[in-house]
């Protein structure tokens, strides 16, 4: 198969690319990487020595594509499907890129900081950094609430790359800093994302791995009820 995605079912940034692939039914091989296993991770580091997932390998064009937004734009150009995840109109495309960056930088980054800090041993934790990260999430929620207005999706009526970024970011962030009662549009948007077939498929595939998430008890009840019993 021409396209091979190196990633992991628990990783939120991998979810973002999987949503894009599933939205358009793009054929690809989903290769799960265990970073703790040298054999499993060998190809990832060979193609992208930084070792960050996901990485897309296009064997047909002998191309290695890292970074989620670049991967999705690459797919949109070289393997277009019925759903254009990046509009042709320049101004609309800029809005999509802006909100794609917003979710990566101001939702994903702070949630990653909080989760990473949880895994640190005592004496190496960063309570000040965690407090800042929680504050960033709270600010981001308010901005998303305002941006949504009457939109179905984050930049309008069309599902785009920005919504691919939003889905996993909000899914994990909500387990750390729940949405406020004064954010009904954000909550409704979150529910629409959960109901999107592409994201529902991603979450279903991640069910066996959610037990490794440090905040698994804060996952939505509907997800916890579907997780395999140990």
PLM feature segments, named:
Residues 1-131, 220, 230:
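GST-like domain detector, emphasizing the conserved glutathione-binding G-site
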Residues 103-198, 202:
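GST-like fold's C-terminal all-alpha helical module
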Residues 2-4, 175, 195, 226:
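Acidic/proline-rich low-complexity IDRs
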Residues 35-36, 159, 208-209:
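Positions that flank functional sites
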Residues 206-230:
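Acidic/histidine-enriched, glycine/proline-rich intrinsically disordered or flexible terminal extensions
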Residues 88, 201-209:
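Short, flexible loop/turn segments with low-complexity composition
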Residues 17, 56, 198-199, 211:
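Compositionally biased, intrinsically disordered low-complexity segments enriched
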């Amino acid at each position: 198969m021409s396209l091979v995605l190196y990633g992991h079912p628990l990783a939120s940034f991998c979810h973002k690319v999987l949503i894009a692939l599933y939205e358009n039914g793009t054929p690809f091989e989903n290769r799960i990487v265990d970073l703790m296993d040298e054999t499993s991770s060998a190809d990832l580091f060979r193609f992208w020595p930084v070792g960050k997932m996901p990485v897309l390998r296009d064997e047909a064009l002998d191309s290695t594509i890292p970074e989620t937004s670049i991967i999705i734009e690459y797919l949109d150009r070289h393997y277009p499907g019925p759903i254009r995840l990046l509009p042709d109109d320049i101004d609309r495309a800029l809005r999509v890129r802006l909100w794609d960056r917003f979710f990566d930088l101001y939702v994903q980054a702070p949630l990653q900081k909080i989760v990473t800090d949880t895994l640190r041993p005592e004496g190496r934790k960063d309570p000040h950094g965690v407090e800042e990260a929680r504050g960033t999430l709270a600010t981001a929620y308010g901005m998303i609430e305002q941006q949504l207005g009457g939109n179905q999706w984050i930049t309008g009526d069309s599902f785009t790359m920005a919504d691919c970024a939003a889905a996993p970011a909000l899914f994990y962030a909500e387990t750390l800093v729940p949405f406020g009662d004064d954010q009904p549009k954000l909550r409704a948007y979150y529910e629409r994302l959960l109901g999107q077939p592409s994201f529902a498929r991603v979450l279903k595939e991640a069910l066996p791995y959610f037990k490794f998430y440090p905040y698994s008890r804060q996952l939505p009840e509907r997800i916890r009820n579907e997780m395999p019993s140990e």
